[in-house]
């Protein structure tokens, strides 16, 4: 038998290299950004703020309404005239601020709008605001702590006067002691005079017994039937009958 013929391998074709998709280009790596050079600051001097020569708009408007004191309220034209004459400012520049304040003050209740709507019309202060303005005037008249110190000084003076008043009390005590000594001297004299009385008291005690005997004797002769002598009258009556 013959040997089988060796198989011949077919050459392997290389796979086609994938082509990059169209439209997408590979981005090159960005170079690091260099730090920006700082711009030199301008050394220009700042303009100083000019201080306003007039008070705030709210204060000017409220002052205008309070000084005008119109019953129906002050109009926008009257407020503008007052501000221009009182504060000497360009009112036309302040008109938008005045209108804004009038609207906000009506919403808050600081001003009352008597007529019109918005910034047009007439405005006046509410009655409650007038009372609040009057109250702070009465507050500064209450300095009371000064009155506490002089009271202590007067109390010390009274304490000094009390020991001086004790001298007349000592004189009274000496005067009262003198009559007390006189009474003590009078008492032994009365005891000596009273000493002989108890000796005579014993015979005197017998006298009341004699008086009692005399009283009893006086009572005995008083006979009650003697007082009944008027009972003899009925005896006279039968004698009168015999005469008839």
Curated annotation (Swiss-Prot):
Enumerate the subcellular locations listed in this protein's record, separating them with semicolons. Answer: Nucleus; Chromosome
InterPro entries under this entry? H1/H5 (IPR005819), Histone_H1/H5_H15 (IPR005818), WH-like_DNA-bd_sf (IPR036388), WH_DNA-bd_sf (IPR036390)
Q: Where is the composition biased (Basic and acidic residues)?
A: 35-45
Q: Which Pfam families match?
A: Linker_histone
- Protein's GO biological process: nucleosome assembly
Supply the alphabetized keyword list.
Chromosome, DNA-binding, Nucleus
Q: Specify the H15 domain's residue ranges.
A: 53-127
Gene Ontology CC terms, in alphabetical order: nucleosome; nucleus
Physiological role: Histones H1 are necessary for the condensation of nucleosome chains into higher-order structures.
Q: What is this protein called?
A: Histone H1, orphon
Q: What is the lineage of its organism?
A: Eukaryota, Metazoa, Ecdysozoa, Arthropoda, Hexapoda
């Amino acid at each position: 038998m013959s040997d089988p013929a060796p198989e011949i391998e077919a050459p392997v074709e290389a796979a086609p290299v994938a082509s990059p998709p169209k439209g997408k280009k590979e981005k090159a790596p960005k170079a690091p950004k260099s730090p920006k050079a700082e711009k030199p600051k301008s050394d220009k001097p700042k303009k100083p703020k000019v201080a306003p020569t007039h008070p705030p708009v709210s204060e000017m408007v409220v002052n205008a309404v309070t000084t005008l004191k119109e019953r129906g309220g002050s109009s926008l034209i009257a407020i503008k005239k007052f501000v221009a004459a009182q504060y000497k400012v360009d009112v036309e520049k302040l008109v938008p601020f005045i209108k804004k304040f009038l609207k906000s003050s009506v919403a808050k209740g600081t001003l009352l709008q008597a007529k019109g709507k918005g910034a047009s019309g007439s405005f006046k202060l509410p009655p409650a605001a007038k009372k609040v303005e009057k109250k702070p005037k009465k507050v500064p008249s209450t300095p009371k702590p000064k009155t506490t110190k002089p009271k202590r000084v007067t109390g010390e003076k009274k304490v000094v006067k009390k020991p001086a008043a004790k001298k007349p009390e000592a004189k009274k005590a000496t005067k009262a002691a003198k009559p007390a000594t006189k009474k003590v001297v009078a008492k032994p004299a009365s005891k000596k005079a009273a000493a002989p009385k108890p000796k005579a008291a014993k015979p005197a005690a017998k006298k009341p017994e004699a008086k009692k005997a005399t009283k009893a004797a006086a009572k005995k002769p008083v006979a009650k039937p003697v007082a009944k002598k008027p009972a003899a009258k009925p005896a006279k009556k039968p004698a009168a009958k015999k005469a008839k």
